[in-house]
């Protein structure tokens, strides 16, 4: 009876947490889209984790002599990003206050990303190997910025958190250890 009560309380708590965690991250603004997301982790937590990861990437690239090796290319990216950053308030007013940063890593990889909180990273390979114009760079950068503005990383972390919580509840119901429950997952 006690186990059933505990399980019921845990399931109710998980349900309440899930329902209260659904929210929108951006205004419909110019895009006219209002999408509900499961957001159980705070923006501040995600931005802090992103800043730590971004700084680690910068330190590693700097130590290997791969950070911002082409100043003209870096300035080009900063100019493009400044034009795009000027528009973020249309989609998400608080993003205009983010501490935006732009860096390049010398690598042949075709990659670029924008982390929560406005941490922009371009690998030189995507620019050089594809011989991108400013407009093409802006399209890639804008696309990556949209992931940060729409908080896709926060949503992904929240889903992982909900999954782990669900595994914990299931383990409790069936009397499994956390390891057994994760193995079953």
Role assignments for model-derived ranges:
Residues 2-185:
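A Zn2+-metalloprotease active-site environment signal
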């Amino acid at each position: 009876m006690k186990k059933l009560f505990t399980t019921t309380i845990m399931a109710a708590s998980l349900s309440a947490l899930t329902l209260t965690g659904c929210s929108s991250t951006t205004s419909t603004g110019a895009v006219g889209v209002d999408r509900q997301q499961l957001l159980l982790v705070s923006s501040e937590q995600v931005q802090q984790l992103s800043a730590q990861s971004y700084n680690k990437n910068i330190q590693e690239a700097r130590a290997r002599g791969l950070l911002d090796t082409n100043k003209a290319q870096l300035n080009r990216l900063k100019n493009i990003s400044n034009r795009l950053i000027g528009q973020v308030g249309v989609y998400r007013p608080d993003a205009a206050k983010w501490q935006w940063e732009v860096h390049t890593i010398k690598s042949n990889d075709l990659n670029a990303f924008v982390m929560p909180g406005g941490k922009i990273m371009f690998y030189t390979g995507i620019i050089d190997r594809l011989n991108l114009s400013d407009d093409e760079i802006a399209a890639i950068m804008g696309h990556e910025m949209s992931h940060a503005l729409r908080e896709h990383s926060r949503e992904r972390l929240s889903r992982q958190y909900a999954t782990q919580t669900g595994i914990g509840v299931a383990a409790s119901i069936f009397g499994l250890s956390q390891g057994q429950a994760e193995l079953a997952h």
